Amino acid sequence: MLSCLLRNDKRLEVFFSALDMKKSYLLALSGGSDSLFLLYLLKSRGVSFTAVHVDYGWRESSYREAEELKLRCQEEGVPLIVDHVPSKYTTSKDPENTARRYRYALFCKICREDNLAGIFLAHHANDQAETVLKRVLEGASLGNLKGMTSGASYNRIPLLRPLLHIPKQVLMQTLDAENIAYVHDVTNTDERYLRARMRNKIFPWLEEIFAKNITQPLLTLAQDSEELSCYMKQQAQPFLENIRQEHTTWSIEIPKPLIEQVFLAKWVCKEFFYKVGIVVSRHFLQMVYDHLSRNLPAEMRLRDKRVIVKAGVVMIE
């Protein structure tokens, strides 16, 4: 059933047809349903990979689970690296982000040492929906609601996520049908962590209120955001080609026809600041646009920089 289901998935076909099968990769293997599904998927596709399991020691059963993974990978002929995380990384005030930084640094280190071409991650449709909703509630811009992508990078190493369109329930049902055992990580339901609170409380509550599954609408929003971002980059590029640098001064022309297109004008200004190495707030961007649209000269401080707005020009010194 596993192979049959996966062979009928058009998006997986597209993903793997573009993958360089001559290279070897790294699989982040937790032992949960998601990463085990991905392990068998990669095997069924003939992908060469090394699995890496990070044991944080957060659960009493974690050492035993790591040993069971060793046996499973040995049976499947999959090379496995097990890393036991030092306690100083597991007792921080922000364990979620500390753990994420640790394992990504480890994955990158192994990729470079073993000449592995990318990192396979088992994020699925529910993870994607959580990411999008989190960004909506945090006030992300329309172009930044796209969530995770199937091919991103971290420290110049590709992050490969082929399961983003597949719901977790499908992964679990497929493994259950094949009698493939997997770890039920209790930290996934530990409400000390934001993701667990979203999973246990916010999503069920919203689905009860709306009487519908909200995952697919959020995935659609992510797709729309990605398409909008690509479109805006194309529209902004001709204006960004007018960026000039003289010594330590950067400048860009913002002509009147552009100023009349509010969304595009602010996008161009934001990208201009970003290319100079500055991330600006919505409030600051709005101030810059307001002075441009009213043709009012202004000087503003932005950390150690001076931003000058003149008629149709923004300068950074």
Curated annotation (Swiss-Prot):
InterPro entries per the UniProt record, alphabetical: Rossmann-like_a/b/a_fold (IPR014729), TilS/TtcA_N (IPR011063), tRNA_Ile_lys_synt (IPR012094), tRNA_Ile_lys_synt_N (IPR012795)
Q: Which UniProt keywords apply?
A: ATP-binding, Cytoplasm, Ligase, Nucleotide-binding, tRNA processing
Q: Which residues bind ATP?
A: 30-35
Q: Which GO terms describe its molecular function?
A: ATP binding; tRNA(Ile)-lysidine synthase activity
Q: Key word tRNA processing present in the record?
A: yes
GO cellular component labels: cytoplasm
**Protein's UniProt keywords contain NADP:** no
Its Enzyme Commission number(s) read: 6.3.4.19
The biological processes this protein is annotated with in GO are: tRNA modification
**A single Pfam family, by name?**
ATP_bind_3
Catalysis: reaction(s): cytidine(34) in tRNA(Ile2) + L-lysine + ATP = lysidine(34) in tRNA(Ile2) + AMP + diphosphate + H(+)
Predominant subcellular localization, coarse grouping: cytoplasm
Location relative to the cell: Cytoplasm
UniProt cross-references to Gene3D superfamilies, sorted A to Z: HUPs
Q: Which family, according to UniProt? A: Belongs to the tRNA(Ile)-lysidine synthase family.
Q: Show the domain comment.
A: The N-terminal region contains the highly conserved SGGXDS motif, predicted to be a P-loop motif involved in ATP binding.
Role description: Ligates lysine onto the cytidine present at position 34 of the AUA codon-specific tRNA(Ile) that contains the anticodon CAU, in an ATP-dependent manner. Cytidine is converted to lysidine, thus changing the amino acid specificity of the tRNA from methionine to isoleucine.
UniProt-listed HAMAP family: tRNA_Ile_lys_synt
Under what name is this protein listed?
tRNA(Ile)-lysidine synthase
Native species: Chlamydia abortus (strain DSM 27085 / S26/3)
Q: What is the name of the gene encoding this protein? A: tilS
